[in-house]
């Protein structure tokens, strides 16, 4: 998946305008900076919603993270403003870009000798067995490269595991304890070794997705692809089918019915709406084809867009769609950010219930507009209600 190295002029002007308005200000309530170091983009965005809520509740400015791309053999850091509009997320809570923070705020507010890492509790180092227990915030990839990229090293650790609820500030007394233990006068920056938010995210933060609007670059690429390739109305589908994912789904236990990754997006909190099965997590090709054909027929779709981490099944889908005389399309080369934006604009979306990548699309479709846009999931059939007359 490719990422351009140059921001569009519109994005650049937007970021600069926002930064200039903030450049001479520092927040007396302090800052929060963190590494979105758990998993790939879907997981990172999932936790980011919780971090936004956490920063807002503590009344600190959030330093917008660099998102992490795992591209063998290197790890790439993608600035937040390259993907999303800074001004829109600032409508939810106070934020500052990583570049603004590191260049103009960090040197004075958070000098090198005061940089401490925050984690739940001390742990043993993985690679250096002789090291004392601690946060070890720069141990391994992507942790080390993430902090190195912004030129941060830590001189000590702070632990918050004794705070009731940890970073769940909804628990009684939690916010007060945070403010008492880590006052902004003594701790102007709370630097977390990982996201201070639960994973998977809870439904109470999903609506925050409406403040994450794609950058003008990504939006224009999505519009351009749709205009050139997708006749409307169109169905968009996300297929999660690489080998690692299949192995994850093999361990699903229907007797315990525990939530897995984003599964609560379709089965409800605690799975009170149903049971997670292997077929929902990793649907068969037959199941996928049947549901695509069903959804195409239900809205009279004129085209289908497919995003996938491995097998887009374009040939199989097109064969199944022959009676409708329409075709499926994909991006070549693939760009996951543009794919997400395209799926968000579809007339109907079919995703993977367990995938946090699919969940980005579902949340956007549920909350970005005045009313939710239709979405469905593979392996889950809509229940037809019987009405007695």
Curated annotation (Swiss-Prot):
Pathway: Protein modification; protein glycosylation. GO terms for molecular function: peptide-O-fucosyltransferase activity. It is found in: Endoplasmic reticulum. Glycans are attached at residue 24. Residues 1-21 form the signal peptide. Its EC number is 2.4.1.221. Keywords: Carbohydrate metabolism, Disulfide bond, Endoplasmic reticulum, Fucose metabolism, Glycoprotein, Glycosyltransferase, Manganese, Notch signaling pathway, Signal, Transferase. The keyword Glycosyltransferase applies. GO terms for cellular component: endoplasmic reticulum. One of its GO terms (biological process) is fucose metabolic process. Changing residue 240 to A/K: Abolishes enzyme activity. Belongs to the glycosyltransferase 65 family. Manganese is bound to the substrate GDP-fucose, but is not required for enzyme activity. Catalyzes the reaction that attaches fucose through an O-glycosidic linkage to a conserved serine or threonine residue found in the consensus sequence C2-X(4,5)-[S/T]-C3 of EGF domains, where C2 and C3 are the second and third conserved cysteines. Specifically uses GDP-fucose as donor substrate and proper disulfide pairing of the substrate EGF domains is required for fucose transfer. This is GDP-fucose protein O-fucosyltransferase 1. It comes from Caenorhabditis elegans. The lineage of its organism: Eukaryota, Metazoa, Ecdysozoa, Nematoda, Chromadorea.
């Amino acid at each position: 998946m490719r990422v351009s190295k140059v921001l569009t002029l519109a994005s650049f002007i937007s970021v600069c305008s926002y930064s200039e308005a903030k450049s001479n200000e520092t927040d007396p309530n302090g800052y929060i900076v963190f590494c979105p170091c758990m998993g790939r983009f879907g997981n990172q965005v999932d936790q980011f919603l919780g971090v936004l809520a956490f920063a807002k509740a503590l009344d600190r400015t959030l330093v917008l993270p660099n998102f992490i791309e795992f591209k063998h053999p290197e790890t790439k850091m993608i600035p937040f403003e390259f993907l999303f509009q800074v001004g829109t997320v600032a409508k939810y809570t106070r934020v500052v870009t990583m570049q603004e923070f590191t260049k103009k705020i960090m040197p004075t507010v958070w000098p090198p000798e005061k940089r401490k890492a925050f984690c739940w509790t001390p742990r043993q180092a993985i690679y250096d067995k002789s090291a004392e227990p601690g946060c070890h915030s720069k141990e391994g990839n992507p942790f080390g490269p993430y902090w190195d990229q912004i030129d941060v090293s830590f001189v000590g650790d702070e632990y918050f595991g004794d705070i009731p609820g940890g970073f769940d500030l909804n628990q009684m007394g939690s916010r007060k304890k945070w403010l008492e233990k880590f006052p902004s006068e003594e701790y102007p920056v709370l630097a977390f070794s990982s996201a201070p938010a639960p994973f998977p995210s809870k439904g109470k933060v999903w609506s925050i997705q409406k403040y994450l609007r794609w950058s003008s670059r990504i939006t224009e690429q999505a519009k351009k692809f749709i205009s050139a390739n997708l006749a409307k109305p169109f169905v968009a589908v996300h297929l999660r089918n690489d080998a690692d994912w299949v192995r994850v789904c093999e361990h699903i236990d229907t007797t315990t019915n525990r939530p897995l990754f984003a599964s609560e997006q379709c089965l409800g909190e605690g799975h009170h709406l149903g049971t997670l099965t292997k077929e929902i997590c990793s649907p068969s090709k037959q199941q996928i084809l049947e549901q695509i054909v069903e959804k195409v027929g239900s809205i009279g779709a004129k085209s289908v867009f497919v995003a996938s981490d491995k097998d887009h099944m374009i040939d199989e889908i097109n064969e199944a769609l022959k009676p409708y005389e329409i075709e499926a399309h994909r991006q070549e080369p693939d760009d996951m950010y543009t794919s997400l934006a395209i799926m968000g604009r579809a007339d109907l979306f079919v995703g993977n219930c367990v995938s946090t990548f699919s969940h980005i699309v579902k949340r956007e479709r549920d909350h970005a507009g005045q009313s939710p846009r239709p979405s469905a999931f593979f392996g889950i059939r809509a229940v037809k209600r019987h009405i007695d007359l």
